[in-house]
Amino acid sequence: MVLKTELCRFSGAKIYPGRGIRFIRGDSQVFLFVNSKCKRYFHNRLKPSKLTWTAMFRKQHKKDAAQEAVKKRRRATKKPYSRSIVGATLEVIQKKRTEKPEVRDAAREAALREIKERIKKTKDEKKAKKAEVASKAQKSQGKGNVQKGALPKGPKMGGGGGKA
């Protein structure tokens, strides 16, 4: 069975069920005190940090060193581990790492040039197709091509098509 304990708003002591004094301020803020001494000091506006027996004072003056001695866990530092990436072996990565910047720049420029040429080629092909389509459309318009069976647009006639 687990008991739901509360903390005294003045002294910081544990308050077990059925114990304590509950004070509800005008702004609906709830204060729970362990005994009338804490309640009295709170209403007299005494500072719990100045009273030696409160949890706040003990914490400020490092009195509960035995209680606070919780081990700080150090994170294990991860050792660098070299492994290959999908699509590239360790040898390829090492070779790229050791090659000179000039060689790397030259390879990058060559790749960019190749990409630009490919883009230009596709653009030229699209332009040629557009021109071809436009010339075909002009030839077909020149002949006076009229669709067969097309009715002239005009006002619609009819009564709405409802039940009679």
Curated annotation (Swiss-Prot):
Main location: cytoplasm
GO terms classed as biological process: cytoplasmic translation
GO MF term set: mRNA binding; structural constituent of ribosome
Basic and acidic residues compositional bias, start-end: 117-133
Subcellular localization, as worded in the UniProt entry: Cytoplasm
Region Disordered, residue ranges: 63-82, 117-164
Annotated GO CC locations: cytosolic large ribosomal subunit
Organism: Cicer arietinum
Name of this protein: Large ribosomal subunit protein eL24
Classification via PROSITE patterns: RIBOSOMAL_L24E
Keyword hit for NADP: no
UniProt biased composition (Basic residues): 71-81
SUPFAM superfamilies hit by this protein: Glucocorticoid receptor-like (DNA-binding domain) (SSF57716)
Family: Belongs to the eukaryotic ribosomal protein eL24 family.
Record keywords: Cytoplasm, Ribonucleoprotein, Ribosomal protein
